[in-house]
Amino acid sequence: MSRSYVFWNSQSGKRGKEGLESLKAKLNDDELDIADVINFAGYREYLSDIKGDDKIYIVGGDGTLNRFVNETDGMNITNDVYYYPAGTGNDFLRDINTTPEECPVKINKYITDLPFVEVNGKKYRFLNGIGYGIDGYCCEVGDKMKAEGADNINYTSIAIKGLLFHYQPTGCVITVDGKRYEYKKVWLCPTMNGRFYGGGMMATPGQDRLNKEHTLSSMLFYGKGRLKTLMAFPSIFKGEHITHKDMVAIHTGKDITVEFDRPTALQIDGETVLGVTKYRAYSAK
């Protein structure tokens, strides 16, 4: 009899537990092997005895998925892998046009040959995108608030306050497949595998995570002051920011390096990396 390995994230709070219980109800006829990814030995050890007809279920948000694809990288998993959303964000689910009611959803085709990012001497796979600029700043501030005991973090509020008062834009050099571009007063410069990141921002509406060329897209918000940038910024949630040609640019390629002129926080699928001046994102193919 096949088994179902269920991995969930207890740090997703109440939503994580609710997601686990909801999935268990849907899989009530299956033999379940449940593990909390915060308190277990790791995927490699846990899945060492997995059989060919066993299934894998990931319960959590984008960060939980990111951890799975990085910790299983190189394991050549051929089993069916399913995703069941819990926590906040869920930009991956939004990008593949799937609702929570339609889950669990099989995700094997979405987690094969994922792109890499190199930052501060380390290399990671990423699922949705690399946030750099005020979006990384928002994650940095949000992490501090969580450490101080805050539960519901309003990242939109953090972004607005950052645009108005706290965040300082940077100079930026972006190199796309060997071609160099320079920008001044850059507010953010994410590089995307999908369209969505940051809890619903459609940064690159033309990006397709399954495109046959395996290209990535970088988007820059640049060149304007605080008030004009703040007025245009909400349009990113519908992907309409790209109509602001004088302050938004998109570059597409397979090998993209972004350099800022001062250290700035970066986020990889919602996971924060501090003090970054440069990152390189590139296709696995």
For every predicted segment, state its role:
Residues G16-K17, R67-N70, F92-R94, Y137, ...:
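Short glycine-/acidic-enriched loop or helix-start segments at secondary-structure transitions
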Residues K123-G131, Y137, E182-N193, Y197-G198, ...:
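Short hydrophobic-aromatic micro-motifs
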Residues Y5-W8, A35, G74-W187:
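Catalytic core of DAGKc-family lipid kinases
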Residues G178, L210-E213, L220-K285:
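ATP/nucleoside-binding phosphotransfer catalytic cores, i.e., glycine-rich phosphate-binding loops
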Residues M1-V59, T64-N66, N70-I77, T98-E101:
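ATP/NTP phosphate-donor binding region
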Residues E21-K24, D73-G74, D143-K144, P205-D208, ...:
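Short, solvent-exposed amphipathic alpha-helical segments in soluble enzyme
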Residues K146-S157, G194-L227:
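Gly/Ser/Thr-rich active-site loops/lids in small-molecule metabolic enzymes
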Residues Q168, T175-R195, G199-L210:
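Mixed-charge interfacial surface used for oligomerization/domain docking
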